[in-house]
Amino acid sequence: MAEFATIARPYAKALFGLAQEKNQIESWLGGLEKLAAVVQEGKVALLIDRPETNASEKADILIDLVGLKDKELKNFVIVLAGQKRLSILPEVYAQYQDLTLSFNHIKSAVIYSAYPLTDKQVGELAQMLNKRFDSELKISVEIEPELIGGIKVEVGDQVLDLSVQGKLSALYTTMTN
């Protein structure tokens, strides 16, 4: 959701900056991952949305559920709870993860395929994409049957659409203009 991304960005950047200062980038990534997963669970999501539960109770429950030990991460959860922003934790995690990859000179890539890919195919694609984008890529694969065939690759804001659906859309656009 674009709105969540906009709201989460300053929180992710601030937390990442603090993590750099404290030399805790990787360890906080793990804590954020757990927090993001917990707030998406049904009962916890309902609790977060309940106006009757005050912010400090929500923060304490999350901190206990995840088992956070780090003082700064606990304070971060308390700040988010006070601002009624706990629901953006998954987006904060995603952006923090992107900042971590960027810091380590790695880009995130998603390969969308109409059909499951073998490990060999993913490996070959990874080699080609690493060369094309002149960067080390962390690749994930998602199945999207609506592509009909072929693949679509997203690296940051760049999209390489080699799918049948993409070609049909381009053909349709050409024919209707």
UniProtKB/Swiss-Prot annotation:
Q: Which UniProt keywords apply?
A: ATP synthesis, Cell inner membrane, Cell membrane, CF(1), Hydrogen ion transport, Ion transport, Membrane, Transport
Record's subcellular location: Cell inner membrane
Q: Which SUPFAM superfamilies match?
A: N-terminal domain of the delta subunit of the F1F0-ATP synthase
Function in brief: F(1)F(0) ATP synthase produces ATP from ADP in the presence of a proton or sodium gradient. F-type ATPases consist of two structural domains, F(1) containing the extramembraneous catalytic core and F(0) containing the membrane proton channel, linked together by a central stalk and a peripheral stalk. During catalysis, ATP synthesis in the catalytic domain of F(1) is coupled via a rotary mechanism of the central stalk subunits to proton translocation.
Kindly state the subunit structure of this protein: F-type ATPases have 2 components, F(1) - the catalytic core - and F(0) - the membrane proton channel. F(1) has five subunits: alpha(3), beta(3), gamma(1), delta(1), epsilon(1). F(0) has three main subunits: a(1), b(2) and c(10-14). The alpha and beta chains form an alternating ring which encloses part of the gamma chain. F(1) is attached to F(0) by a central stalk formed by the gamma and epsilon chains, while a peripheral stalk is formed by the delta and b chains.
Q: How does it sit in the membrane?
A: Peripheral membrane protein
Task: Offer a single GO CC term for the protein.
Answer: proton-transporting ATP synthase complex
Q: What is this protein called?
A: ATP synthase subunit delta
- Predominant subcellular localization, coarse grouping: membrane
Q: Give this protein's Gene Ontology molecular function annotations.
A: proton-transporting ATP synthase activity, rotational mechanism
Classification via Pfam families: OSCP (PF00213)
Protein family membership: Belongs to the ATPase delta chain family.
Taxonomic lineage from the root: Bacteria, Pseudomonadati, Pseudomonadota, Betaproteobacteria, Neisseriales
